Amino acid sequence: MRIDLNCDLGEAFGNYSFGGDNQIIPLITSANIACGFHAGDENVMYDTIKLVKDNGVGIGAHPGLPDLKGFGRRNMDITPKEIYNLVVYQLGALDGFCKVHQTRINHVKPHGALYNMGAKDKNIAHAIAQAVYDFDSSLILVGLSNTLLITEAESLGLRTASEVFADRRYEDNGQLVSRKEADAVITNTEEALDQVLKMVIENKVVSKNGKEIDLKADTICVHGDGAHALEFVSQIREKLTKEGIDIQSL
């Protein structure tokens, strides 16, 4: 049994810095690097790719909606064509810096609102998947387990990775509880660790209402920001290793 640990990185821009990328990178196996629309800029992309490559971590593009002020977490009234083009644009930007560092993109994971819109809207899911396929059909598309983004990508012949979340609660339909709700994020470490093991070993998760949901877990999203982020990720790694689960990149 194996699992990937992924984290969203490179989300600083200009004079603004977020999270502790230097500390979290050695603990993960895949990095989702912001491409300049919701966060990140040309200097941050350059530095982050170098850091990720030097640590032997898989490089992923993390395209988002063009919304710096909202950190890409606000829905936008945007057409599938616009979605397609903004994904291609951001992949091209990150790919350029990968070429400079003599490495390549391994996977793509949409960010924030784009991720959630793709999970629920078939047309948007198809636009994201088509953009990835047309850019490089060998890339892996990461999406929320059991959602439209995964099925649309697979219908095109793309490889996919079904993602689960260590510290997020789930609705009865398998969607993530909105961050607007007070209980969306699991703050108790033991509860989060128990959820991780259930998802990875049993392929199940218990919703906020107590319903047991089947899911597939190829990769676990962990977060590098917050006061106890590093300790939390270390505990996840330790728990998985004790259960005999290999932690490997996609």
From Swiss-Prot:
Listed SUPFAM superfamilies: Glycoside hydrolase/deacetylase (SSF88713)
Signal peptide (residue range): none
Broad enzyme group: hydrolase
Any one biological process term the GO annotation gives: carbohydrate metabolic process
InterPro entries assigned: Glyco_hydro/deAcase_b/a-brl, LamB/YcsF/PxpA-like
EC number: 3.5.2.9
Alphabetical keyword list: ATP-binding, Hydrolase, Nucleotide-binding
Any coiled-coil regions, as ranges: none
The family this protein is said to belong to: Belongs to the LamB/PxpA family.
Protein purpose: Catalyzes the cleavage of 5-oxoproline to form L-glutamate coupled to the hydrolysis of ATP to ADP and inorganic phosphate.
HAMAP family per the UniProt record, alphabetical: PxpA
Listed name of the protein: 5-oxoprolinase subunit A
Source organism (scientific name): Staphylococcus haemolyticus (strain JCSC1435)
